[in-house]
């Protein structure tokens, strides 16, 4: 997600400084872009203070989405956010601190009604719990720092691998169904999220607010896979994974990687996530406050994403 945002900022004429961990030798998708690099660590406040010195805006997009322990999630999502806010709170030039949270911080909708910002946060995974805790940290520092919090739903697009596995199944002619087939989703195309981040950052109206940002349309997982199958020219066969089977596979996957430093892609919490019926939210408040309108339909976004996956040899 960060690389899409960096590209948009450069297109708009901003000078961009990216914080890169000391332990990371490569720059990933931004390695060929005209940016300034600041080496540092989210666990070293002095390095964060040096990296953010003199900046007008801080966009905190990094986070831990997969980990093997509560400590790793907490350090990557809560402690990192606290340290960054501690580092920037006395910067006299700072106009906005934009924190990218997640729909996971609010949890799924229980009755199918898209969640709004005043819905109580009931996260169901450790990732969601720690993103909600990080939002609380933002609220505490919001007394001294101009902050906006964005909660995107599932994000897809070029460079993103979160939906890659499902699209690989579709490409093989298989349409997986997890639990109930009437699963409903809010989605957002990655470059559109970058545009929303910039809108939220530059608007004075957004300071002190939390927003869901998404495509206003709600899709079923079946509909999403059928659109992908049509683009790929595939006929698909539905294969159902009952809840008990998905949990069994997840448990075996966790056990198999228990001695590895690599977290399982499908673990028990991810299975719980996949089995929820309604991962939906309403972006109406964000639209009302900023005028932001999603400009990329699901079919357009999937077409571009699938084309990119093929070009990269991912599909």
Where are these regions (language model features)?
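Conserved Rossmann-fold NAD(P)-dependent oxidoreductase catalytic core, especially the SDR/UDP-sugar
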Residues: 79-126, 148
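N-terminal Rossmann-fold NAD(P) dinucleotide-binding loop
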Residues: 2-3
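N-terminal Rossmann-fold cofactor-binding loop
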Residues: 19-24, 42
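Catalytic helix-loop patch of NAD(P)-dependent Rossmann-fold dehydrogenases
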Residues: 110-155, 175-179
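NAD(P)H-binding glycine-rich loop region in Rossmannoid oxidoreductase-like domains
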Residues: 35-76, 106-108
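Glycine-rich NAD(P)-binding loop of the Rossmann-fold in SDR/ketoreductase-type enzymes
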Residues: 43, 72-83, 125, 129-130, ...
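Substrate-positioning beta->alpha
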Residues: 129, 133, 160-165, 178-201, ...
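Mid/C-terminal beta-alpha module of Rossmann-like enzyme folds, strongest
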Residues: 199-266, 283, 299, 303-306, ...
């Amino acid at each position: 997600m960060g690389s899409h945002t960096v590209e948009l900022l450069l297109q708009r004429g901003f000078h961009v400084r990216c914080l890169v961990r000391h332990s990371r030798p490569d720059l990933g998708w931004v390695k060929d872009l005209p940016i300034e690099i600041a080496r540092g660590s989210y666990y070293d406040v002095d390095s964060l203070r040096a990296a953010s010195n003199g900046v007008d805006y801080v966009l905190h997009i990094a986070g831990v989405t997969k980990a093997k322990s509560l400590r790793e999630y907490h350090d990557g999502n809560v402690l990192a956010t606290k340290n960054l806010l501690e580092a920037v709170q006395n910067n006299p030039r700072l106009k906005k601190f934009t924190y990218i949270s997640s729909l996971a911080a609010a949890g799924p909708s229980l009755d199918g009604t898209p969640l709004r910002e005043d819905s109580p946060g009931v996260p169901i995974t450790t990732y969601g719990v720690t993103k909600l805790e990080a939002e609380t940290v933002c609220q505490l520092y919001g007394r001294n720092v101009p902050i906006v919090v964005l909660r995107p739903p599932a994000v897809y697009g070029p460079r993103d691998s979160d939906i890659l596995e499902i699209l690989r199944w579709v490409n093989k002619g298989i349409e997986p169904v997890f639990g109930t087939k009437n699963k409903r989703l809010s989605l957002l195309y990655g470059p559109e999220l970058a545009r929303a981040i910039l809108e939220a950052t530059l608007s004075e109206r957004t300071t002190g607010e939390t927003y869901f940002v998404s495509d206003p349309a709600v899709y079923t997982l079946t509909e999403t896979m059928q659109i992908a199958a049509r683009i790929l020219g595939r006929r698909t066969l539905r294969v159902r994974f009952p809840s008990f089977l998905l949990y069994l596979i997840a448990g075996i996957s966790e056990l198999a990687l228990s001695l590895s430093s690599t977290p399982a892609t499908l673990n028990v919490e991810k299975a719980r996530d996949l089995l929820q019926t309604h991962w939906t939210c309403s972006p109406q408040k964000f639209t009302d406050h900023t005028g932001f309108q999603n400009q990329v339909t699901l079919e357009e976004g999937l077409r571009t994403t699938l084309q990119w996956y093929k070009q990269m040899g991912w599909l």
